Amino acid sequence: EDQSNFKENLKIINNQIKQIENLVNEFSDFARMPKPILKNNDLIKILDENIKLLSEVDKSITIDLIKTNNQIIFNCDKEQIARVFFNLIKNSIESIQQKVEKNVSFKKKISIEILSNDHHIKLILVDNGIGFNQNNNIKEILSPYFTTKKQGTGLGLSIVNKIINDHNGELEFYPENDGAKIEINFKLNGNWNFNSWW
């Protein structure tokens, strides 16, 4: 019994060490986030690469990409935008996995839609995971150290938001009846004009 207690305590300590490592790494990332190096990149290609990579994490989750164009060129820092897509899709996967832990039987899916016109690029990500608490507002969700995950540091979304802001964009969260919806709007030129969507 003493040995099993020792093993359990060791496991807890190891998990705590990992959490501290994650926190230190993410905090240094947040503090040292370089200015974006802007080049013309294809957002569809960056999205496709991240979807392929993250589809391997949990093959029981369907990830659909809905696109109106085969190519959307955006003047951006490829590494930073890839990190945004990676973090948001990974969050959706983890949210669905948390729902599965509650023994809920459902069709696990993530839908990503990307639209563009002369003024904006809009990305809409919808998942049917545990979702956001209706009581949490956008400032809470994006504040450093806010997290709903057992092992989370709460810095991931702050980093994502900073990258999006640095690319002249905005991040919005919408609680859904069954999951969550996230929207990213990148402004391409001039002032925000949401009426310009078709």
Question: Which residues are covered by each model-predicted region?
Answer:
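Conserved glycine-rich
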Residues: 169-170
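ATP-lid-like helix-loop hinge signature
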Residues: 93-118
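Detector for a conserved hydrophobic position within an alpha-helical segment of the HATPase_c
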Residues: 164-165
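Conserved micro-motifs of the catalytic ATP-binding
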Residues: 33-36, 73-76, 148
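Short conserved segment of the HATPase_c
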Residues: 132-144
